[in-house]
Amino acid sequence: LLPLTQAKLPFVPLNDFAPVGQVSRLPYFLAVSATQPYKSAKDLLADPKARDGALAYASNGIGSMAHIGTEMLIQRAGAKMIHVPYNGFTPAIADLVTGRTVMVMADLAPLNAQLQDGKLRPLAVASEKRSPFLPDVPTLAEAGYPGTEFEVWLALYAPAKTPRAVVDKLSAELNKVLANPATREAFVRLGHEADYAAPDAVRKRIQAEQSAFAPAVRAAGLAAQTN
């Protein structure tokens, strides 16, 4: 997303780097305080208060994936909410629990303790499919908001001029490593899902996400200024 928010990057991602393969995905969940009445994403986003700017959502910082992804969801849901950025998820979730904000989009690691204690309620996962970490939580598409998927994902890259034969060999080895049960379990402990994707799929994903996120970046006032 950097090309969308920063005008003077010292590199052009898809020109200066060659994708080797996707490594893992980190799903994001929409969560609210358990004291809130909302039982689904639609309950929240269709609430009249969520449409007139009376509700606030938290993020771990301006320009973060949580910020931009939530703006995309709100925009496509026809809602209007106040953004309250925090310096990380820890204070954001603390205020969410106490009711200072109404929702947050975050990965499982900062949410897990409060979910286990029953202080937070997960309403949806922003991935294309349900997460094995919380399989009973529906996707945003299932909740009535298709096209709002987002997540943090990791990929391996090589310099742009790396011969394709070398890239393909590295990609094949990456696929083997990620298929190893021990490797997959190690990612689970980090809250990630090991999920290989080929170089061309990574390139297409970058292009698709830049197009999908551009309106949300503009709506959040984060679009790169060229002058």
Language model segments and positions:
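Short beta-strand and adjacent tight-turn residues that come in two discontinuous sequence segments
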Residues: 22, 86, 105-106, 125, ...
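Hinge/capping helix and adjacent helix->loop/strand transition within the periplasmic-binding protein
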Residues: 4-91, 140, 153-186
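Short helices/loops that flank or line small-molecule/ion binding pockets
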Residues: 71-76, 90-104, 109-117, 206-209
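Short secondary-structure boundary segments
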Residues: 34, 107-109, 127-128, 160
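Conserved functional loop/turn residues at catalytic and ligand-binding sites
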Residues: 40, 85, 99-100, 107, ...
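Ligand-binding "clamshell"
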Residues: 3-18, 78-80, 114-125, 132-144, ...
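An extracytoplasmic/periplasmic, membrane-proximal ligand-sensing/linker region
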Residues: 75-76, 139-142, 164-227
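Paired acidic/hydrophobic, glycine-rich loop segments that form the ligand-binding mouth/hinge
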Residues: 56, 102-107, 122-124, 213-215
